[in-house]
C-alpha cells in the first residue's frame, strides 16, 4: 500500500535490534485519516471472507482493527493484556511474548464475545515473530472458531511470523511488507 510505505519512509525510524519506530502515526500518536484508509484496504482485501468479528490485541492493533470493523460492519474484540475488576473469569487466555517490550503477557478475551459460528479476522499493527497472532490463533482454537484471515499493517518478512501464518494455510494480508533494514533504511518487499 503505497500511502503506508511512503509514510513509513517519511516518519518511521529504524532502531537497533530490527525495531521500526512508527509511534508518530500508529503506536502512540494515531493518524485517524491513515487508519481509515488502512481499514478500507483491509475491508477490500477480506470482503469475500464472510467475517463476523475482528480480533486484535491491545493497544496498537485497536485503531486499524476498529477502522476495518467499521468498513466490514462487524464488531471488534481486543484481547486485554491486564485483568481488571470487570474482566475476571470465564475467559479465553493465551500467553504472548512481546518482542519490543521483552515481556510475556497473558491476553484474555471474555468467552461471551465468541460463538462457534464466528469467522474472525485477526488484525494487528506488526507481524514480526508472530507471537501476538499466535496467541489469538490459540484463543480461536480453544473457542473452536474459524480464523478467516490475518491482516497486519506492517510485516517484517525477514522474521518468522509471515512463514508461521502462511504455513498454517491462513490468508495473510500485509499492507506494508518489509524485506530488510539496510543502513538505517527500510527496504520493502517487491511482491
From Swiss-Prot:
Its EC number is 2.4.2.22. One of its GO terms (biological process) is xanthine metabolic process. The keyword Transmembrane does not apply. It is found in: Cytoplasm. The keyword ATP-binding does not apply. Its main location: cytoplasm. NCBIfam families: PRK09219.1, XPRTase. Converts the preformed base xanthine, a product of nucleic acid breakdown, to xanthosine 5'-monophosphate (XMP), so it can be reused for RNA or DNA synthesis. Homodimer. This is Xanthine phosphoribosyltransferase. The gene is xpt.
